Amino acid sequence: MAPFLASPIRLHPCPLLFSHPHLFGSDYFAFSVKGRGAHLESMRVENKRGNRSWGTDAKRTHPNSIFNQLVRYGYIGTGFPDMNCSLTWSLIGGPSTLSLPSFFPSAHLLLSLALFFFLCIQSNHRMSKSGCERCRGRGFWDTDDQDTYFFKVMIGGFRRQMTIPYKFAENFRDQIQGTIKLKARNGNTCSVLVDKCSNKLVLTKGWAEFANSHDIKMGDFLVFRYTGNSQFEVKIFDPSGCVKAASHNAVNIGQHAQNMQGDPIEILSCSDEHLRAQSLTTERQNQPEKDVIDNCNKKMKTEHASSSEDDQETPTAEVHRMKVEEMVRAIHSNHPVFVAVMKKSNVTRQPCYVAISRKYANEYFPGGDQMLTLQRHGKRWQVKFCISKRKLRMLSKGWRKFTRDNELQHWAPLALFITLFFSPHFRKMKKCGQKMRKLNTRSTARDDQEKYFFKVMIGDFHKRMTIPDKFARHFKGVISKTIKLEPRSGYTFDVQVTKKLNILVLGSGWESFVNAHDLNMGDFLVFKYNGDFLLQVLIFDPSGCEKSTSCSMENAIDHVGQGWKEHNDISTSYHDQPKGNKHWMQKDSSSKGNKIGNTRSSNTPSKFSGCILPRGTCLPVVQEKKMKEKIQAIHSKTPMYGNVMTKCNVSGSPCVLEITQLYDDAYLPFNNGQELMLRHRDKSWKVRFYRFKNKSRKLTQASSLYKMRRPGARCREGHAHFNGNHIDGQYKNFFKVMIGRFRERMIIPNEFLQYFRGKIPRTIKLQLRDGCTYDVQVTKNLGKISLQSGWKAFVTAHDLQMGDFLVFSYDGISKLKVLIFGPSGCEKVHSRSTLKNATHCGEKWEEPLHISSNSHDLPVKSPQNVSKSEKQWDSSEQENDTANIEEVALQGDDLQGHPVLNCILPKHTRLTDMQKQQLESKVGAIHSEIPIYGCILRKSRVHGKSQTVDICREYADVYLPFKELNMTLQRHGKNWEVLCRTKDTRTKRLSTGWSRFAQENNLQVGDICLFELLKKKEYSMNVHIIPKK
């Protein structure tokens, strides 16, 4: 609706200034329209920044045709008064104002005011009108809808610029460009310029500083949320899906110089006059950056006047001030920056050094002489910081190499006055009461009580072991000089911690731990930090199974069960004793008198629910549990006596076994020297019982038959097998390294299968630390048990990569608890997004299946009708599919009359000796990790109208878990698309496309087709043919 005036009135040119709700940031535009009557002379739209303008000569043109172009861009409403006018108005972001000449007549003033407010009301009315589909569709930039998101993945040249998605960019006006603010999670903001390039909105100037300050890398994931007022909130995620920890360099860019409170800038050189110069005052708290630079300039002028001939080559203070100002703005550091102007003496004098002011050195290098690391362009140099006899703080040893590698030549003008910045690795602690940034708790998924890392024993692991840097951060700079290592045996070892080149190293005491547990090259150790500087250790051998330490501990510990200090009454129950781990003090093998002595125990005979132990006996959890089971199985009315075998009991001279006086007085009414009979496993031995003057009771003579010799290699293997199968009925451990084709399946070590005691369910649950579980089916192929169906979904959900380490812990009830470690040795933390593919544990478990020695090379996975997209099995179907693996294997023998290694044939297949020999030779030449499916072609498969090939259910359920899919058959470099679908009998049938494959490859009746499933290509098969003739 166009405004209307009763009679034509001539208006003097005057600016009408009013706000416009569509403007972006500080951009504003000017629209100039001049003309008389129904014709306009010209119209021009100009960006007041001068970087964009457009106009048109509108002679003999009706004003509505001109203003319709403005309407098209949404800046004004439709129509314009048909009158003689000459108006100029500007759209800005400020308040509505009106400016008129002072000599303007009152009548004209009233008419101008009426016209102005009418246009404002028309524009605002049309913008707020709910029926404006154009406005609602475009989602204008500064509308009330502020919760607008988009994300970007950092790929390609993301460091230079970033393009805003096209759909989101529709919120910008086509002609609007300006500056937006990016706000990170730590509250720091950065101003970034938005430019239009090839009809795309691009973040250019300021984006590189934002990316560098927040350490954004390739593959990072950024989520942008528009909060209004041209400001975005940015959340940064790393490739693992976790929120990225805020970088120490993430400061408020653009206001860095103003916000650095109390951070001085030191500008010094190596001349004696400069060494006596004082550092800049720290009264920079409320001083703007320009004043700081001016102070630097004044100081440089003073130094310049008093310098030597070398210093006379110094450029003007103004040039130096500009360089310093530019570099200060370019560096974004939370630490004070030290500036040193390079002189001729800094690069040519012998010895070559650069001096650092005393105030700066005392505050940020308080440790005296130390080695520092200088970084430039990704390279590092070790430089020594020292204090000379003249109390000068300087960088000396290694500085000359730094100058040479960076080509700092004194004759080059740029090299003479290069300004170097040193940002120390120490953070200046703020005084109490100042506002301090809160720690980023989200970046730490759990508290410090349960942190894991692993180490592989390689190199000179016998002498020392380094702790990963990422794990060392959990100590938060506070580390004890001694840390405790606690293996599964329950004994603790004190190991000293030293720091070498900023790396934590386990030194003194580590060698004793290695010898006690017989650690060898390739062993795999998992450490769990439980607080109070205690590391629990799991030890694995190269096979991936947990290593038994009982035998090796026997060699390292001289006395077990002796030297106990605490004393309790015999009537005291064992369970009333304070629980604690046995603690051993070690000395390195290099020191004399190397012994591992017991320093902590309880020390009176104790009653163990029907068993009396000697004073001070403290058993590990494993032995305690086994002892309880043994006592309950015996059902003795008389309390039993138990003792822990020590060195003197099995190898002493004489070899004796001591019995406590209290037990003797109550239950051994024998005469001194009386013979007793000991029985074990249907054998008997005679021993003699003695009472000595020191009131000790001992069994001697024949007890030497019980002598336990130091185990050899064969004995150790037997002990390892026995202890591994009998210690602690739950939580057996093994590990796997993700190498090769780990995404398809994972093989369980044969040594670990003994813990299942011959029984394993068809489905095993994998449980992560966050509590979510994944159902993975178990198959048997080529004599190996592997996790297959469902394993790929687990790998994908947790983004397992080549080189990752997985530690599995079996709880005894068909559940494997999993810890995931990255190649760095530290535990990987995953986002909550992995929960969507997980199924929580149920209360019911499947009946276990018996693994018989009769099972051969056939897959034993339970048949399931699942589609390709299905990643979890329905629990009700699983309960109905449990069967005996031995029965399946026997069926396999019936199905496959002539079994061939790594090849599955359909039921009732009969091969001649020649065919079997050819088949074994062909299968062996293929070297396929996945079993090959073979079939003999009958007439219906190569002749007739409906030529098809059936794949047996046993193979299809395991390796072709889909209902219908187009598969690719390959032979001699050619490809054929063949439809594979599921029949009612749950077998797979190759139908559409098979006849063409058979004709082009000239297949004949009696030929043997071998289908090799390829791993690199999804559901592609390489076909091998053995001709009949």
From Swiss-Prot:
Keyword Transcription: yes
One Pfam family of this chain: B3
Extent of Polar residues compositional bias: 591-605, 852-867
Location of region: Disordered: 572-605, 852-882
Subcellular location: Nucleus
Keywords from the named record: DNA-binding, Nucleus, Repeat, Transcription, Transcription regulation
InterPro entries: B3_DNA-bd, DNA-bd_pseudobarrel_sf, REM16-like
DNA-binding region as annotated in the record: 147-240, 339-430, 450-543, 731-824, 934-1029
SMART domains assigned to the protein according to its UniProt record, in alphabetical order: B3
Gene Ontology molecular function: DNA binding
Any single GO CC term annotated in Swiss-Prot or TrEMBL for this entry: nucleus
Entry annotated with the keyword Transcription regulation: yes
SUPFAM superfamilies xrefs: DNA-binding pseudobarrel domain
Record's protein name: Putative B3 domain-containing protein Os03g0621600
